[in-house]
């Protein structure tokens, strides 16, 4: 769905050591392991939302290879991506897959890599949603809203989104856990409708 995702992920914070003594006290090999595993969980969660051929900018404020180069290699091999090189001037003093090291650049330090998701951009096929099949929209609810709206059933409640955004909402709901989309209208109660608070 997205052409570009920037994932500035939570990390062990080695780039914060000079200005935050608590970051030094909190650092441990166990915390580094916790961080690189959490980072992979985050990346796996956002990856389906990146279009084939789309770009991922992956960044941390730490320097160890577990959270930096190893995760970039994991993205390339496990999720399917090409690591891109960004031409930079030698006097910028940026190393490897773009380590911005304190003492060489302004700031406390950072790591960055750019990857292109495998595949060629194409139309997205919307997967059918899990749960109850959509019922035909109740005509009574059409009288509750003005304008051109698309109605859909989600968690036993009818929702409405502007018709011009219906395909985008359906696409997002097919690959992400969308908590809220549009306006919840009502929940069926027998032959009646219980209006939602969002109205």
Model-derived segments and their meaning:
Residues 50-52:
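Helix-to-beta-strand junctions that scaffold the AdoMet/dcAdoMet cofactor pocket
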Residues 7-44, 61-68:
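Mobile active-site "lid"/loop adjacent to the S-adenosyl-L-methionine
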């Amino acid at each position: 769905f997205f052409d570009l995702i920037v994932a500035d992920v939570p990390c062990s914070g080695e780039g914060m050591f000079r200005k935050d003594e608590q970051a030094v006290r909190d650092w441990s090999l166990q915390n580094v392991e916790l961080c690189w595993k959490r980072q992979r969980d985050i990346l796996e969660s956002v990856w389906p939302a990146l279009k084939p051929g789309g770009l991922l900018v992956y960044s941390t404020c730490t320097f160890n290879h577990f959270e930096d180069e190893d995760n970039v290699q994991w993205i390339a091999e496990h999720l399917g991506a090409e690591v891109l090189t960004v031409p930079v001037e030698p006097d910028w003093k940026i190393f490897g897959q773009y380590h911005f090291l304190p003492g060489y650049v302004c700031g406390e330090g950072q790591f960055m890599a750019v990857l292109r998701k495998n595949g060629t951009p194409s139309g997205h096929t919307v997967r059918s949603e899990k749960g109850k099949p959509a019922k035909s929209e109740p005509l009574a609810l059409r009288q509750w809203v003005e304008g051109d709206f698309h109605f859909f059933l989600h968690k036993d409640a009818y929702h409405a989104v502007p018709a011009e955004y219906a395909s985008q909402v359906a696409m997002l709901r097919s690959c992400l856990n969308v908590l809220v989309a549009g306006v919840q209208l009502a929940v069926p109660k027998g032959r009646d409708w219980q209006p939602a608070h969002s109205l």
